[in-house]
């Protein structure tokens, strides 16, 4: 309906299969539809993931955005509310084991520590096990990143562009300034659709991209600031043991 505040986003996969960083996370949800549960909303029955899979997805979705350019406090609030409501039906050990597989256990446990300290997360009500608390690290650096990120890491264009460094650090173990300025073809295909069938025009896309940088320099879109943010966030990935 025109003018409706409802926004529906549809994806063929939970996580983009062509991503070198999180493309294989879909395996964590193998068989999820065999475990699906039916819920009723407004008299309509809807089939969806069970509570364990649902919480795991909330964590992984936040984690994905964290590896890009960050996310805001709202997603932490969503996790806290969901855990409070359905914690007794969540297999916390299974969620933890899967978080460990993707090096996200310290990240997830620290998010719940943030939610307990500053939001409404109630560990007793959520049946939150002590085994999770052992993985929680210092909350302040993560909280500061949450406040600086905007809703989905888009607080500034500089922050958005810093994702090239964090993603490269995950795939290659270190940030790469060259990849920040001259990303590979697959990362530019949405911005420059002609690359999909004319890959040999990649140098042209690089030139256009750098020209846009040069002609649109402003306080929130500064390559130097993007590199600074990228280095800070790569250090954060190390602090939460996402990379070595």
What are these regions (language model features)?
Residues 1-244:
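Conserved NTP-donor binding/palm subdomain of two-metal-ion nucleotidyltransferases/polymerases, i.e.
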């Amino acid at each position: 309906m025109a003018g409706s505040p409802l926004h529906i986003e549809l994806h063929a996969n939970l996580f983009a299969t062509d991503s070198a960083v999180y493309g294989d996370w879909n395996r964590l949800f193998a068989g999820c539809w065999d475990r699906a549960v039916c819920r009723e909303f407004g008299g309509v029955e809807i089939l969806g993931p069970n509570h364990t899979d649902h919480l795991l997805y909330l964590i992984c979705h936040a984690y994905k955005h964290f590896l890009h350019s960050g996310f805001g406090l709202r997603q932490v609030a969503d996790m806290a509310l969901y855990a409070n409501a359905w914690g007794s039906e969540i297999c916390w050990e299974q969620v933890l084991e899967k978080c460990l597989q993707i090096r996200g256990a310290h990240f997830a446990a620290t998010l719940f520590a943030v939610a307990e300290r500053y939001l409404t997360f109630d560990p007793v009500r959520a049946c939150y096990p002590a085994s999770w608390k052992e993985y929680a690290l210092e909350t302040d650096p993560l909280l500061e990143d949450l406040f600086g990120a905007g809703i989905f890491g888009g607080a500034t264009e500089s922050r958005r562009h810093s994702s090239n460094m964090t993603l490269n650090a995950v795939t290659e173990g270190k940030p790469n300034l060259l990849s920040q300025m001259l990303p590979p073809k697959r990362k530019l295909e949405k911005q420059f659709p002609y690359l999909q069938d004319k890959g040999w025009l990649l140098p042209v896309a690089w030139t256009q991209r750098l020209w846009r940088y040069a002609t649109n320099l402003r306080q929130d879109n500064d390559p130097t600031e993007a590199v600074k943010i990228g280095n800070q966030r790569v250090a954060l990935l190390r602090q939460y043991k996402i990379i070595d």
